[in-house]
A protein has these predicted regions:
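Mixed-charge, low-complexity intrinsically disordered segments
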Residues: 272-294
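C-terminal motif of bacterial Sec signal peptides marking the signal peptidase cleavage site
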Residues: 21-23
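Core segments of small alpha/beta cavity-forming domains
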Residues: 41-93, 165-233
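Bacterial signal peptide processing site
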Residues: 25-27
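Surface-exposed, charged secondary-structure patches
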Residues: 91-135, 234-278
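N-terminal export leaders
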Residues: 5-9
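Bacterial N-terminal signal peptides
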Residues: 13-18
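Short beta-strand edge/turn micro-motifs at domain boundaries
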Residues: 131-189, 250, 254-258, 290-345
């Protein structure tokens, strides 16, 4: 699995994101050098060989955990939202008997990049091969820890339309924060705008972002047909996991940013005596009773990747991909009524 030295180009006219392995040293990382003043010099945290070896280790460990649907084994190769969302996929797959809820993540990379820092945590990113590439964010929390997958997403479009690696255009990258500057938007503002687009699809932000697969999934949930016997409310909120990614200091100067969001789908019975039954992934986590007596609330977590162009660019923030899983289902049976009408609904 030999990574190439090419840059990540985002979709929708967003600026080139230089995830170039030229940002990695050709040799083993050295101890931090210092300037004449004694201030440590930020250096690449990995070289290309090490990044490939890390991703090979991740693929092997993930294959074992996936086969057994063993969330404990994920701790060896995943952390943060990646581990939480993969564990949720295992739970839904086990409850439903359908392994399709465990979505593939490919680590054979086309290209990648690493942050330059003197401290921890340390970040790296990679884009996989394939028609629908995985975009992966890696994190090392301390010198004693292994690099682990902190987040990953599946590209929203085919390879020809979104992240493709075509050329080398940057030598340095700094790690992003929620308030990173030098971009058309801070990462936090980009996430807030996208969450607003999910909540208000006809609003200003709703019109600014393309109709991607996550937006379609949220809208499909919002329009679930309960046959006039109930109502559905969908609400998205920014996640609490923070932000990771790389901001290029040369070339186009854009940033690749990973973060999370949460959305809840509340199914409420509104007609006294009606009988509403849920199907699909939500029903699988409801145990033996799939009926809506009062309300049923499904909570989903999504990892999301953004391309944020350099400040002054005419390009806009683009959403590159997402990975979503059903985290939990809560029910409130405070009103128990005798059924007189019936309907069933399958969440999208």
């Amino acid at each position: 699995m030999k990574p190439t030295r090419r840059a990540l180009l985002s979709a929708g006219g967003a600026s080139a994101l230089a995830l170039s392995l030229a940002a990695c040293s050709k040799s083993q990382p050295k101890t931090a050098q210092t300037q004449a003043s004694g201030t440590p010099i930020a250096e690449p945290v990995l070289n290309d060989k090490q990044l490939s070896e890390i991703l090979q280790r991740v693929q092997t460990g993930l294959a074992t955990a996936d086969k057994e649907k063993n969330a404990d084994k994920l701790k060896e190769v995943m952390s943060g939202p990646a581990a939480r969302i993969r564990a949720a996929e295992y739970a839904t797959a086990s409850a439903s008997g359908n392994n399709d809820f465990i979505h593939p993540m490919t680590t054979t990379i086309q290209g990648g990049g690493v942050g330059q820092t003197v401290g921890f945590p340390r970040n790296a990113a990679a884009a996989s091969e394939g028609a629908s590439p995985s975009l992966i964010s890696l994190e090392q929390n301390s010198a004693r820890d292994q690099f682990k997958v902190w987040a990953w997403v599946q590209g929203f479009s085919e390879k020809k339309n979104i992240p493709v690696l075509t050329k080398q255009s940057a030598q340095r990258a700094k790690q992003v924060t929620a308030d990173s500057t030098g971009l058309v938007s801070t990462p936090k503002a980009a996430l807030d705008a996208y969450v607003d687009a999910l909540n208000h699809p006809d609003g200003e932000n709703g019109k600014a972002f393309p109709d991607d697969l996550l937006r379609q999934k949220v809208q499909a949930a919002r329009t679930t047909n309960l046959s006039s016997l109930g109502e559905v409310t969908v609400t998205a909120t920014a996640g609490k996991d923070g932000f990771q990614g790389l901001q290029m200091e040369e070339g186009d100067g854009g940033a690749l940013v990973f973060t999370t969001l949460t959305y809840t789908v509340v199914y409420k019975r509104t007609v006294d005596g009606s009988d509403l039954t849920l199907q699909g992934d939500v029903a699988a986590l409801m145990g033996g009773n799939q009926k809506i007596v009062g309300t049923v609330t499904a909570t989903y977590d999504s990892m999301v990747a953004f391309s944020i162009p350099k400040e002054g660019s005419k390009d806009k923030v683009a959403v590159l991909g997402a990975e979503t899983a059903l985290i939990k289902v809560d029910r409130d049976d405070s009103k128990t009524l005798a059924p007189t009408a019936s309907a069933s609904a399958k969440p999208s």
